[in-house]
């Protein structure tokens, strides 16, 4: 055990004790960056090992969110750009996605905490077996409303806006709506995330300071927090620091 671990535990307790429950972000979105770099640092040439560790980290983060009363989590798992990665890595990722979505139906913790699971993105780009697994996961949790976990997979924020405007244009062409009726609410209703509250806080790991196409429309007034830790190495103290930073900010919403 690291000699610093007891100190971090004490620090975790201190931060958690001073967080205000009435100022907790309701929706936290996460860019889970750094899995591949983690694999290399561990001496593995197989990036899938880093992605497996990343899934374990996501499970821990979801537990922390339950403890803190955070109701909505959106995790950026796989972008449309990621399809350009080596074929072996993409196939390995799809296998991981399929296995983990399939496991949701029998996950006791998911059902105990009444967590609804949803996938958002251009899902038609995914292999059929992954889409079936997503359908199983969504169907097995659709009755829950206490908490919501969105997995952004096959997702790109620009493409999301393009697809939304294309659907609206088709409705205009069909005479279902007038161009004058188009407003922000209509665009919101046609996004992959339709019906989802905008994120209050977006966290990105690995030290990169950009959104990389994540929730571009929805993040106008989101607070951003960048963490140096690689995603598989994220500690609870890192997550608590992000929440503390959010609570220390004054949200102006453009005013």
From Swiss-Prot:
Binding, Mg(2+): 33, 223
Catalytic activity: geranylgeranyl diphosphate + 7 isopentenyl diphosphate = tri-trans,hepta-cis-undecaprenyl diphosphate + 7 diphosphate
Residues bound to substrate: 34-37, 51, 79-81, 83, 85, 204, 210-212
Cofactor list: Mg(2+)
Record's keyword terms, sorted: Magnesium, Metal-binding, Transferase
Active site location: 33, 82
InterPro entries assigned: UPP_synth-like (IPR001441), UPP_synth-like_CS (IPR018520), UPP_synth-like_sf (IPR036424)
SUPFAM superfamilies the UniProt entry points to: Undecaprenyl diphosphate synthase (SSF64005)
Family to which this protein belongs: Belongs to the UPP synthase family.
Described function: Catalyzes the sequential condensation of isopentenyl diphosphate (IPP) with geranylgeranyl diphosphate (GGPP) to yield (2Z,6Z,10Z,14Z,18Z,22Z,26Z,30E,34E,38E)-undecaprenyl diphosphate (tritrans,heptacis-UPP). It is probably the precursor of glycosyl carrier lipids.
Assembly, per entry: Homodimer.
PANTHER family for the chain: DEHYDRODOLICHYL DIPHOSPHATE SYNTHASE COMPLEX SUBUNIT DHDDS (PTHR10291:SF43), DEHYDRODOLICHYL DIPHOSPHATE SYNTHASE FAMILY MEMBER (PTHR10291)
Protein name: Tritrans,polycis-undecaprenyl-diphosphate synthase (geranylgeranyl-diphosphate specific)
Organism: Methanothermobacter thermautotrophicus (strain ATCC 29096 / DSM 1053 / JCM 10044 / NBRC 100330 / Delta H) (Methanobacterium thermoautotrophicum)
